[in-house]
Amino acid sequence: MAEDELAEIRRRKMAEMQQHAAMQQQDMERQQQYEAQMQMALMQILEPEARERLNTIKLTKPDFARAVEQQLVMLAQSGRIKNKISDDQLKVILQQVTPAKREFNIRRKG
């Protein structure tokens, strides 16, 4: 009887692991599909130079670049972007979106 119970536990554990692996695979496929849709949308929104600039930013600040991409796609979907965005226009957008930097001055008494 103990062997039967042990075999049942192993079978359940194996099924659970397979289900978990299948869910991870589905999540990964969904993420890849989302990324492909995002890139297609950006190709329609941005001129090549602007896309290149955004890809360069993505290398150094991936979270910031992703946020900008999402905002651009949302603007395009809402109809607020009529023409392709040029590199100069993207620079302006990036300056507006970039949080203000604080400067610290350290003064030494002596």
Swiss-Prot record:
Classification via SUPFAM superfamilies: Double-stranded DNA-binding domain
Keyword DNA-binding: yes
GO function terms (MF aspect): DNA binding
GO cellular component annotations of the record: cytosol
Keywords, comma-separated and alphabetical: DNA-binding
Keyword Transferase in record: no
Protein's UniProt name: DNA-binding protein Mhun_3016
Organism of provenance: Methanospirillum hungatei JF-1 (strain ATCC 27890 / DSM 864 / NBRC 100397 / JF-1)
